[in-house]
Amino acid sequence: MEFCSWLKVRSKGGDTVLFHTFSNQEERRNYGGSAFIEIQFCKLPAKTKRKDLAKKINFWQNDSLYIDDVETFFHEYSHIFNCGMYSNLESGVVDLYGVNYYAPNFIDPIIQRLKEEKTAEYEIVIEWLDKAKRYNGFYILGI
């Protein structure tokens, strides 16, 4: 059985694996359990009230990106994902231990910043964000 579907790119002087995908829950559990940040499509309707966006999340989706290197992710991406809405409806830098929602209108500006700054494995994030345009934005779900 293949252990995990890896997304690999050469980044900042070496092979790194910052982002992971899993084809099922068993794969994820075998790899590392639940100690991941999850970047997940928001599949709720566009008319969902803002206060309800954080209440109806289904964690551990197979089309999500998973991050186990929290420190590197924060260092590389916190200044880019600095416009998310927390579950208390406040906004700010990505909360690594909470729910962060990014509305669809934030996707293109985030992609533009990624192209300019070329953060670690930014190509993977851009490809995933292009798919997020089909949905009602996305979440970054902390550990």
Residue positions per predicted region:
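Acidic (Asp/Glu-rich) sequence patches and key acidic residues
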Residues: 1-127, 131-135, 139, 143
